Amino acid sequence: RKAPRVHVPVWQSFALSEVELTDSYFKKAMDLHKGYLLSLDVDRLIPHVRRSVGLQGKGDNYGGWEKHGGCTYGHYMSACAMMYASTGEKALLDKLNYMLDELQECQKQTPDGWFITGKRGKEGYLQLLQGNVVLNQPDETGQPWNYNQNGNSWYCIHKILAGLRDAYVYAGCRQAKDILMPLADFISHIALNLSLIHISEPTRQEAI
Protein backbone atom coordinates (compact mmCIF):
# COMPACT_ATOMS: atom_id res chain seq x y z
CA ARG A 1 0.00 0.00 0.00
CA LYS A 2 1.39 3.38 -1.03
CA ALA A 3 1.83 6.06 1.56
CA PRO A 4 -0.55 9.00 1.13
CA ARG A 5 0.87 11.74 -1.01
CA VAL A 6 1.84 14.84 0.95
CA HIS A 7 1.25 18.10 -0.83
CA VAL A 8 4.21 20.44 -0.49
CA PRO A 9 3.56 23.94 -1.84
CA VAL A 10 6.03 25.06 -4.47
CA TRP A 11 5.86 28.61 -3.21
CA GLN A 12 4.00 30.65 -0.65
CA SER A 13 3.40 34.33 -0.19
CA PHE A 14 5.04 36.53 2.42
CA ALA A 15 4.35 39.95 3.85
CA LEU A 16 6.05 43.06 2.48
CA SER A 17 7.32 43.74 6.00
CA GLU A 18 9.32 40.50 5.85
CA VAL A 19 11.64 41.96 3.21
CA GLU A 20 14.24 44.56 4.19
CA LEU A 21 16.51 46.12 1.60
CA THR A 22 20.13 46.78 2.48
CA ASP A 23 22.14 49.66 1.05
CA SER A 24 21.89 49.15 -2.70
CA TYR A 25 20.49 50.58 -5.90
CA PHE A 26 17.08 49.15 -4.99
CA LYS A 27 17.15 50.74 -1.51
CA LYS A 28 18.02 54.12 -3.01
CA ALA A 29 15.20 53.79 -5.54
CA MET A 30 12.77 52.84 -2.78
CA ASP A 31 13.84 55.84 -0.68
CA LEU A 32 13.29 58.13 -3.67
CA HIS A 33 9.81 56.71 -4.15
CA LYS A 34 9.03 57.12 -0.47
CA GLY A 35 10.22 60.72 -0.53
CA TYR A 36 8.05 61.46 -3.54
CA LEU A 37 4.96 60.01 -1.87
CA LEU A 38 5.60 62.10 1.22
CA SER A 39 6.05 65.24 -0.89
CA LEU A 40 2.58 65.08 -2.44
CA ASP A 41 -0.23 67.15 -0.96
CA VAL A 42 -3.38 65.10 -0.43
CA ASP A 43 -5.53 68.22 -0.68
CA ARG A 44 -4.24 68.78 -4.22
CA LEU A 45 -5.00 65.21 -5.27
CA ILE A 46 -8.71 65.29 -4.42
CA PRO A 47 -10.17 68.85 -4.61
CA HIS A 48 -12.34 67.80 -7.59
CA VAL A 49 -13.73 64.92 -5.54
CA ARG A 50 -14.84 67.32 -2.84
CA ARG A 51 -16.33 69.73 -5.37
CA SER A 52 -18.26 66.94 -7.11
CA VAL A 53 -20.31 66.36 -3.94
CA GLY A 54 -20.84 70.03 -3.12
CA LEU A 55 -17.90 70.57 -0.76
CA GLN A 56 -15.23 73.21 -1.23
CA GLY A 57 -11.84 72.01 -2.45
CA LYS A 58 -8.95 72.58 -0.06
CA GLY A 59 -6.34 73.11 -2.77
CA ASP A 60 -5.76 73.34 -6.51
CA ASN A 61 -5.32 70.25 -8.64
CA TYR A 62 -1.83 69.41 -9.77
CA GLY A 63 -1.08 70.18 -13.41
CA GLY A 64 -0.70 67.91 -16.41
CA TRP A 65 -2.89 64.83 -16.33
CA GLU A 66 -4.38 66.02 -13.03
CA LYS A 67 -5.27 69.46 -14.34
CA HIS A 68 -8.97 68.69 -14.62
CA GLY A 69 -9.08 66.22 -11.75
CA GLY A 70 -8.11 62.61 -12.21
CA CYS A 71 -8.02 59.33 -10.35
CA THR A 72 -4.35 59.30 -9.38
CA TYR A 73 -5.42 59.35 -5.76
CA GLY A 74 -6.38 55.69 -6.15
CA HIS A 75 -2.83 54.76 -7.13
CA TYR A 76 -1.59 57.04 -4.34
CA MET A 77 -3.50 55.05 -1.74
CA SER A 78 -2.03 51.81 -3.10
CA ALA A 79 1.49 53.23 -3.11
CA CYS A 80 1.27 54.65 0.42
CA ALA A 81 -0.22 51.43 1.78
CA MET A 82 2.43 49.20 0.23
CA MET A 83 5.29 51.53 1.10
CA TYR A 84 4.03 51.72 4.68
CA ALA A 85 3.87 47.93 4.83
CA SER A 86 7.44 47.76 3.53
CA THR A 87 9.01 50.50 5.65
CA GLY A 88 6.77 51.14 8.65
CA GLU A 89 7.05 54.89 7.93
CA LYS A 90 4.26 56.40 10.05
CA ALA A 91 4.11 59.59 7.98
CA LEU A 92 2.81 57.50 5.08
CA LEU A 93 0.07 56.04 7.24
CA ASP A 94 -0.83 59.54 8.41
CA LYS A 95 -1.25 60.72 4.82
CA LEU A 96 -3.29 57.65 3.97
CA ASN A 97 -5.58 58.10 6.97
CA TYR A 98 -6.06 61.78 6.13
CA MET A 99 -7.09 60.92 2.59
CA LEU A 100 -9.51 58.30 3.88
CA ASP A 101 -11.04 60.86 6.25
CA GLU A 102 -11.55 63.25 3.34
CA LEU A 103 -13.03 60.59 1.06
CA GLN A 104 -15.38 59.41 3.78
CA GLU A 105 -16.57 62.98 4.27
CA CYS A 106 -17.32 63.11 0.53
CA GLN A 107 -19.14 59.81 0.70
CA LYS A 108 -21.37 61.06 3.50
CA GLN A 109 -22.69 63.78 1.17
CA THR A 110 -24.19 61.17 -1.18
CA PRO A 111 -27.43 59.20 -0.77
CA ASP A 112 -25.93 55.84 -1.76
CA GLY A 113 -22.21 56.20 -1.09
CA TRP A 114 -21.20 56.74 -4.73
CA PHE A 115 -18.85 59.72 -4.99
CA ILE A 116 -16.19 58.62 -7.48
CA THR A 117 -17.46 60.07 -10.75
CA GLY A 118 -19.83 62.74 -9.50
CA LYS A 119 -23.45 63.14 -10.57
CA ARG A 120 -22.79 63.20 -14.32
CA GLY A 121 -20.68 60.05 -14.20
CA LYS A 122 -23.28 58.25 -12.12
CA GLU A 123 -25.96 59.10 -14.66
CA GLY A 124 -23.70 57.68 -17.36
CA TYR A 125 -23.64 54.31 -15.60
CA LEU A 126 -27.38 54.32 -15.15
CA GLN A 127 -27.70 55.00 -18.88
CA LEU A 128 -25.54 51.93 -19.51
CA LEU A 129 -27.87 49.92 -17.32
CA GLN A 130 -30.79 51.02 -19.51
CA GLY A 131 -28.93 49.85 -22.61
CA ASN A 132 -27.88 53.30 -23.83
CA VAL A 133 -24.26 53.62 -24.95
CA VAL A 134 -23.03 56.71 -26.77
CA LEU A 135 -19.48 56.05 -27.94
CA ASN A 136 -16.71 58.02 -29.64
CA GLN A 137 -17.26 61.34 -27.97
CA PRO A 138 -13.70 62.71 -27.99
CA ASP A 139 -12.05 64.31 -25.00
CA GLU A 140 -10.25 67.68 -25.12
CA THR A 141 -7.36 66.14 -27.11
CA GLY A 142 -9.64 64.54 -29.69
CA GLN A 143 -9.10 61.03 -28.32
CA PRO A 144 -12.32 59.03 -28.89
CA TRP A 145 -12.44 57.17 -25.60
CA ASN A 146 -15.37 58.93 -24.04
CA TYR A 147 -18.77 57.28 -23.66
CA ASN A 148 -21.93 58.55 -21.99
CA GLN A 149 -19.93 61.62 -20.93
CA ASN A 150 -18.00 59.34 -18.58
CA GLY A 151 -14.44 59.42 -19.89
CA ASN A 152 -12.48 56.24 -19.19
CA SER A 153 -14.47 55.48 -16.08
CA TRP A 154 -13.92 51.74 -15.65
CA TYR A 155 -10.21 52.46 -15.62
CA CYS A 156 -10.65 55.14 -12.96
CA ILE A 157 -12.98 53.02 -10.87
CA HIS A 158 -10.45 50.21 -10.83
CA LYS A 159 -7.74 52.56 -9.56
CA ILE A 160 -9.86 53.87 -6.72
CA LEU A 161 -11.38 50.57 -5.61
CA ALA A 162 -7.93 48.94 -5.74
CA GLY A 163 -6.49 51.81 -3.70
CA LEU A 164 -9.11 51.36 -0.98
CA ARG A 165 -8.58 47.60 -1.01
CA ASP A 166 -4.82 48.04 -0.67
CA ALA A 167 -5.24 50.50 2.19
CA TYR A 168 -7.24 47.83 4.01
CA VAL A 169 -5.09 44.81 3.07
CA TYR A 170 -1.60 46.28 3.35
CA ALA A 171 -2.03 49.07 5.90
CA GLY A 172 -4.86 47.61 7.97
CA CYS A 173 -7.11 50.65 7.54
CA ARG A 174 -10.61 49.45 8.45
CA GLN A 175 -11.99 52.80 7.34
CA ALA A 176 -10.93 51.99 3.77
CA LYS A 177 -13.13 48.90 3.75
CA ASP A 178 -16.05 50.91 5.11
CA ILE A 179 -15.68 53.34 2.19
CA LEU A 180 -15.12 50.58 -0.35
CA MET A 181 -18.19 48.44 0.30
CA PRO A 182 -20.92 50.93 -0.76
CA LEU A 183 -18.90 51.74 -3.89
CA ALA A 184 -18.54 48.05 -4.71
CA ASP A 185 -22.26 47.47 -4.10
CA PHE A 186 -23.21 50.23 -6.54
CA ILE A 187 -20.84 49.34 -9.38
CA SER A 188 -21.28 45.58 -9.06
CA HIS A 189 -25.04 46.03 -9.48
CA ILE A 190 -24.33 47.92 -12.71
CA ALA A 191 -21.71 45.48 -14.02
CA LEU A 192 -23.66 42.31 -13.23
CA ASN A 193 -26.72 43.57 -15.07
CA LEU A 194 -25.01 44.75 -18.25
CA SER A 195 -25.08 42.77 -21.46
CA LEU A 196 -21.79 41.61 -22.96
CA ILE A 197 -21.96 44.30 -25.63
CA HIS A 198 -22.50 47.03 -23.04
CA ILE A 199 -19.45 45.80 -21.15
CA SER A 200 -17.19 45.28 -24.15
CA GLU A 201 -17.90 48.49 -26.08
CA PRO A 202 -16.96 50.97 -23.31
CA THR A 203 -13.93 48.95 -22.23
CA ARG A 204 -12.77 48.70 -25.85
CA GLN A 205 -12.88 52.49 -26.02
CA GLU A 206 -10.68 52.69 -22.94
CA ALA A 207 -8.15 50.35 -24.55
CA ILE A 208 -7.67 52.56 -27.63
Annotate each language-model stretch with its function.
Residues 83, 96, 103, 167, ...:
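Alpha-helical solenoid scaffolds that mediate protein-protein interactions
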Residues 197-208:
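Single conserved hydrophobic/aromatic residue that forms the stacking wall/gate
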Residues 86-98, 152-155:
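Aromatic- and glycine-enriched glycan-recognition loops and surfaces
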Residues 21, 44, 48, 71, ...:
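Generic alpha-helical secondary structure signal
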Residues 129-151, 183-196:
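Asp-box/WD-like beta-propeller blade repeats and closely related beta-sheet repeat scaffolds
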Residues 1-72, 91, 97-138, 174:
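Low-complexity, Ser/Thr/Pro/Gly-enriched N-terminal "stalk/linker" regions
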Residues 18-19, 24-28, 76-90, 158-174, ...:
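Well-ordered alpha-helical scaffold segments within catalytic/enzyme domains
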Residues 66-70, 86, 150, 154, ...:
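Alpha-solenoid helical-repeat scaffolds
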